[in-house]
Regions:
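A conserved beta-turn-beta hairpin within the catalytic core of GNAT-like acetyltransferases
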Residues: 62-70, 79-80, 130-135
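Conserved acetyl-CoA-binding loop-helix of GNAT-fold acetyltransferases
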Residues: 74, 80-93
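Conserved GNAT acetyl-CoA-binding A-motif
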Residues: 88, 95-108
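Short amphipathic alpha-helix that is part of the acyltransferase structural core
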Residues: 1-45, 49-55, 141
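Conserved beta-strand in the GNAT
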Residues: 47, 53-61, 66-73
């Protein structure tokens, strides 16, 4: 059974970071300097796991009345199982419960359809965020 937790412990955060390292740095070739930032120390991290270990992660950054969601990563063996949707639904519910009016994210162009299915709408042009991967800003209301 998959459980999604707020990653408040050192162990849970380490598992979030290990998933991000596997997905973004090892699989996608993103430079470590691009992956880790100051927001990691102050944001809320979420971790989906089961008895086999960590499976997915995401983080939420408070920006006024907007919740910025990012670093959504699903372990290779868990892709296509609905777990990405499950962790996003959880994070969106947490943001709504926290009083945020809007959710925003910067989606890799290859997964825009995934976020559209969750109610996000793409805005503006595609851009390279410095990682060499094209992104678009996406938003959705939380009310």
């Amino acid at each position: 059974m998959v459980r999604i937790i707020r990653a408040d412990t050192t162990t849970a955060r380490s598992q979030c970071f290990a998933l991000r390292r596997a997905v973004f740095i090892q699989e996608q070739g993103i430079d470590e300097a691009e992956e880790w930032d100051a927001d990691d120390a102050t944001c809320t991290h979420y971790l989906a796991h089961d008895d086999s270990g960590p499976l997915a992660t995401a983080r939420l950054i408070a920006k006024g009345d907007m919740a910025k969601i990012g670093r959504v990563a699903v372990a290779k063996q868990a892709r296509g199982t609905g777990l990405g949707r499950q962790i996003m639904t959880h994070v969106l519910a947490q943001a709504r419960g926290g009083g945020f009016a809007t959710a925003m994210l910067e989606a890799q162009v290859s997964v825009i359809g995934f976020y559209e299915a969750l109610g996000f709408v793409a805005e503006g042009p595609e851009y390279d965020d410095g990682s060499g991967i094209l992104h678009r800003v996406m938003r959705r209301p939380l009310a």
